[in-house]
Curated annotation (Swiss-Prot):
It holds the Pfam family Sulfotransfer_2. PANTHER family: CARBOHYDRATE SULFOTRANSFERASE, CARBOHYDRATE SULFOTRANSFERASE 9. Residues 34-443 are lumenal. It comes from Homo sapiens (Human). One of its GO terms (molecular function) is chondroitin 4-sulfotransferase activity. Keywords: Carbohydrate metabolism, Glycoprotein, Golgi apparatus, Membrane, Secreted, Signal-anchor, Transferase, Transmembrane, Transmembrane helix. The keyword Transmembrane helix applies. The keyword Transferase applies. 3'-phosphoadenylyl sulfate binds at residues 220-226, 280-288. Its EC number is 2.8.2.-. Residues 1-12 are cytoplasmic. This is Carbohydrate sulfotransferase 9.
């Protein structure tokens, strides 16, 4: 054969490459199918072995939604995998200093200390036992008691057996009028429904003093610092209310709050302890909060609230004010308060009492007022059997050289506001005005 005959023309080269390519592709597809069949066969064989040996995949507990009614809680427990142990009390708690959102609800449960978590988990993976059934029924009993709890909490007649002095007769009459007024208001406008899921937020501002069986709801700018001093003395944490510093009162964490207890503890205390709340004219309380937090140096309120308020409500603000947040004007503060799109959330110092203490849910046994604070507080102390030498302190906790915020001071702050702005402030706090029978002389 001549060398010239061995040379393939381009057409033959193309056909040869095409044939080899098709053949290679078919071979690859065949091998892939064969490998998959082999792998599937092994998997099926393993499954058969595991089924015959009684093995099954673990189904973990589904996460509990944040906001649940009591009925949903019970349904959730019932529908869990029966091979798993649901602890009697599992507790989920969230602390937040600011009331930035309208507060998500906390579902409280508490891990049992009688057995370790790993031990409980290992025991629960078998078939249900009588012990497990009993524990599950016990958990349901707690939730059933919670669901049957009357909302609002029942109001109880005050025990006046320890009040011997006739000088308190007028105070007693005033107290009965306040209680009756609040009770009638709540009957007419309360509208309570499905509040079980909000229980732990509802009681988050309530302090507990077990020795004298007191529940006190903290309302900032209504004598709360001195009330917490009194609770510390009653708890045996101090010998005198006059020797406790501001920082020890607010940052010492010496006092217990009601939301730190389990469901049974909360339920029992709400229905057996004397529940007290002290309130103040909403406009006076608002001005007092502004003076305290924005007219004096403050390492928290100026950078957190002041900067945001100045940035949004002050046109052409200077750089220094935007950096340090100092010098907020009352009118700017009011614009922030009334803004439905606030640049920073609410704070307990100017939050409504209706949202701090929930008077129509808790049904307080004692309603004190800042306007008659010393008289109301000392009558209350005598009524609960406090030591005779313990009197409510009347000193100003902070900025003692400043004049106390009263009606005359409030008028000076309101004079720069329009009538519409003053009306809007009233509208914002109208529930507090109505619940506690405050008039509106500043409009």
């Amino acid at each position: 054969m001549q060398p010239s005959e061995m040379v393939m023309n381009p057409k033959q080269v193309f056909l040869s490459v095409l044939i080899f390519g098709v053949a290679g592709l078919l071979l690859f597809m065949y091998l892939q199918v064969w490998i998959e069949e082999q792998h599937t066969g092994r998997v099926e064989k393993r499954r058969e072995q595991k089924v015959t040996s009684g093995w099954g995949p673990v189904k973990y507990l589904r996460p509990v939604p944040r906001i649940m009614s009591t009925e949903k809680i019970q349904e959730h427990i019932t529908n869990q995998n029966p091979k798993f142990h649901m602890p009697e009390d599992v507790r989920e708690k969230k602390e937040n200093l600011l009331l930035n959102s309208e507060r998500s609800t906390r579902l409280l449960t508490k891990t049992s200390h009688s057995q370790g978590g790993d031990q409980a988990l290992s025991k629960s993976t078998g078939s249900p036992t009588e012990k497990l059934i009993e524990k599950r029924q016990g958990a349901k009993t707690v939730f059933n008691k919670f669901s049957n709890m009357n909302w609002p909490v029942d109001i109880h007649p005050l025990n006046k057996s320890l009040v011997k002095d006739n000088k308190w007769k007028k105070t007693e009459e005033t107290q009965e009028k306040r209680r009756s007024f609040l009770q009638e208001f709540c009957k007419k406008y309360g509208g309570v429904s499905h509040h079980q899921s909000h229980l732990f937020h509802t009681v988050s501002r309530i302090y507990v003093e077990d020795k004298h069986k007191i529940l006190y709801c903290e309302v900032p700018k209504a004598g709360c610092s001195n009330w917490k001093r009194i609770l510390m003395v009653l708890n045996g944490l101090a010998s005198s209310a006059y020797n406790i510093s501001h920082n020890a009162v607010h940052y010492g964490k010496h006092l217990k709050k009601l939301d730190s207890f389990d469901l049974k503890g909360i339920y029992t205390r709400l229905n057996t302890y004397t529940k007290a709340v002290f309130v103040r004219d909403p406009m006076e309380r608002l001005v007092s909060a502004f003076r305290d937090k924005f007219e004096h140096p403050n390492s928290y309120y100026h950078p957190v609230f002041g900067k945001a308020i100045i940035k949004k409500y002050r046109p052409n603000a200077c750089e220094e004010a935007l950096i340090n947040g100092s010098g907020v004007k009352f009118k700017e503060f009011i614009h922030y308060l009334l803004d439905s799109h606030r640049p920073v959330g609410m704070d307990i110092h100017w939050e409504k009492v209706s949202k701090l203490c929930y008077p129509c849910l808790i049904n307080y046994d004692f309603v004190g007022k800042f306007e008659t604070l010393e008289e109301d507080a000392n009558y209350f102390l005598q009524m609960i059997g406090a030591p005779k030498e313990l009197k409510f302190p009347n000193f100003k906790d902070r900025h003692s050289s400043d004049e106390r915020t009263n009606a005359q001071v409030v008028r000076q702050y309101l004079k720069d506001l329009t009538r519409t702005e003053r009306q809007l402030i009233y509208d914002f706090y109208y529930l507090d005005y109505l619940m506690f029978n405050y008039t509106t002389p500043f409009l």
